[in-house]
From Swiss-Prot:
One of its GO terms (cellular component) is plasma membrane. InterPro entries: ThrE_2 (IPR024528), ThrE_Dicarb/AminoAcid_Exp (IPR050539), YjjB (IPR020914). Belongs to the ThrE exporter (TC 2.A.79) family. It is found in: Cell inner membrane. This is Probable succinate transporter subunit YjjB.
Length: 156
């Protein structure tokens, strides 16, 4: 668990910070907050990596990472006087399930081309549901901290 896990975590965080920075640039984020977007993308992906490494499935790990991204984004928005979405949207994009969605789409095309088979339908449904649950976990996890931290009325 020692050095190889730490190296894999560092590599995962750096490789997740690159697309977070790229999407922040596409979204025209102010220059002074670009490093924070990259850092938050790396931290969120690193938390998801560690949660998956220690046995959590990818849907719940994505949910946990999205909650952390939302909390940190709200905190940084107060310090840097920017909207929380400036930090959080670009940071959560590297966690979107591209491979699962692509595999589901390819399975749909193969079903359309080759006809129905139970194996193709199983692959399509498995990957479609996995991608849907991850996207749902990311969107709900990203919105929960705002609901918790900006609530004006008591919960009960």
């Amino acid at each position: 668990m020692g050095l190889s896990l730490l190296w894999a975590l560092l590599q995962d965080m750096v490789l997740a910070a690159v697309p977070a920075l790229g999407f922040a640039m596409v979204f025209n984020v102010p220059l002074k907050v670009l490093p924070y977007c990259a850092l938050l993308g790396g931290v969120g992906h690193g938390v998801r990596f560690l949660a998956i490494h220690f046995g959590m499935n990818i849907e719940w790990a994505s949910f946990l990472a999205a909650i952390l991204i939302g909390i940190i984004g709200i905190r940084w928005s107060r310090w840097l006087l920017a909207h929380p979405k400036v930090f959080t949207v670009a940071a959560v994009i590297p966690m979107f399930p591209g491979i699962s969605a692509y595999t589901a789409m390819i399975s749909v095309v193969e079903i359309s081309h080759l006809g129905y088979s139970e194996a193709l339908m199983s692959v399509m449904m498995t990957n479609f549901l996995k991608a849907s649950f991850i996207v749902g976990a990311l969107s709900i996890g990203l919105s929960l901290p705002g609901i918790w931290l900006y609530r004006k009325r008591p919960g009960v």
